[in-house]
A protein has these predicted regions:
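Secondary-structure end/capping motifs
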Residues: 239-316
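Short, surface-exposed acidic
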Residues: 15, 61-66, 166-173, 275-287, ...
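Solvent-exposed, polar/charged alpha-helical surfaces in well-ordered, non-transmembrane soluble domains
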Residues: 50, 54, 75, 79, ...
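Short, glycine-/small- and polar/acidic-enriched structural segments
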Residues: 26-168, 174-177, 195-201, 225-226
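Sec/Tat signal peptide C-region and signal peptidase I cleavage site
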Residues: 20-25
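Bacterial N-terminal signal peptides that target proteins for export
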Residues: 1-11
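Pocket-lining segment of extracytoplasmic ligand-binding domains
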Residues: 104, 176, 181-272
């Protein structure tokens, strides 16, 4: 998705900063989060291709150190963000919306931009489990950030449709908190009693290549179509105190996103190299080209997702528009 107006805004701000000179000192180091999976591909491209450094230098910030940190879940990134150890968190929409709600009167966390929309699949290696109704008390579901993750909310929304809003937590006792790679391995090994996992690309596609593994639930079916799975968020304090750095990171994210959409093969090669070469370039390229997978800064169907969280009491504040959840820099995009 082209975002020319956004880039004009970012570049104008960068040029203004250079012309005005160092109006005030900005942070000497910017720290960004990474996680596992191709949903985070824009961040991987930013890291490998040095795009944050590029946009910082274009903005006149030549000496800012760029540090990347990996986290196993969005909730872990939230802890680091609030403690001041992280400037830009990344993860599922669930943890981001929860922090937006909790920090309305202090840190004022908002979304910077969406990262990707992609279906999340609840898959199972148990032949008798074909729907949510087939889970017994002994059947466990591995998922990253269980209890607060995006997969948690997808599952709760599906449960509410099946058994009513009053029972939306019916499946919570089945959740086991494991990062996506470990959750996949646990299900495939069968040694831990975990026979299902609610996960993301590429892990769900790897799982489906194994005999007997099948889809139980698709998040797009729950949401009625494509919706934002991953996003980037930050505190208002960081944005206010470091406006040039903030816009440089957003500009880098936009460049990475447009590069992926224009160069899916090169993006697949970059991802495979960065992750150690275990995945097939052809398979990763196929995922990137999948019409169900969108790399875009514009949020998709995030409002009904957040409003469900308010309906069940997960968050206290109810957003009236998708833009309530994000900083103004992307308000001109066609979000939903």
């Amino acid at each position: 998705m082209k975002t020319k107006r956004l880039m004009k805004f970012v570049m104008a701000a960068a040029c203004g900063a250079i012309m005005a000179g160092a109006v005030h000192a900005e942070t000497a180091e910017v720290t960004l989060a990474r996680q596992f999976g191709i949903g985070y591909l824009p961040l991987t491209v930013m890291n490998v291709n040095g795009l944050v450094q590029k946009h910082l230098k274009q903005s006149g910030l030549n000496d800012t150190k760029v540090t990347w940190s990996r986290f196993g879940s969005g909730s872990a990134a939230n802890d680091a963000l609030l403690s001041g150890k992280l400037d830009f968190a990344a993860g599922g929409t669930g943890p981001a919306i929860i922090l937006w709600d909790k920090t309305r009167n202090n840190a004022k966390v908002h979304g910077v931009a969406a990262l990707s929309s992609m279906p999340n699949l609840l898959v199972s290696a148990a032949p008798e489990i074909k729907s949510l109704k087939d889970f017994t008390d002994k059947d466990k579901i591995a998922m990253a950030g269980a209890g607060s993750s995006v997969q948690t909310v997808y599952l709760q929304m599906a449960v509410a449709k099946e058994w009513g809003m009053d029972n939306y937590k019916k499946m919570n006792p089945h959740m086991v908190n494991l990062p996506h790679p470990e959750g996949l391995n646990a299900m495939l090994s069968g040694a831990t009693g975990i026979r299902s996992t609610f996960t993301t690309p590429p892990f769900q596609y790897i799982a489906l290549e194994k005999p007997g593994v099948h889809v139980v639930l698709n998040s797009y079916d729950v949401m009625g179509g494509a919706n934002t799975f991953l996003m980037v968020w930050a505190t208002d304090k960081f944005r206010t105190e470091n406006p040039t750095t903030f816009k440089a990171v957003l500009g880098a994210l936009n460049e990475a996103t447009e590069w992926i959409n224009a160069n899916p093969r090169k993006a697949a090669e970059l991802y495979v190299k960065d992750t150690g070469g275990k995945d097939s370039v052809e398979e990763i390229e196929k995922m990137i080209r999948d019409p169900q997978i969108h790399y875009t800064l514009a949020p998709e169907r995030i409002l009904p997702y957040a409003q469900f969280m308010n309906d069940v009491g997960t968050i206290k504040n109810r957003p009236q528009a998708w833009s309530d959840l994000f900083f103004p820099e992307i308000h001109d995009l066609k979000g939903s």
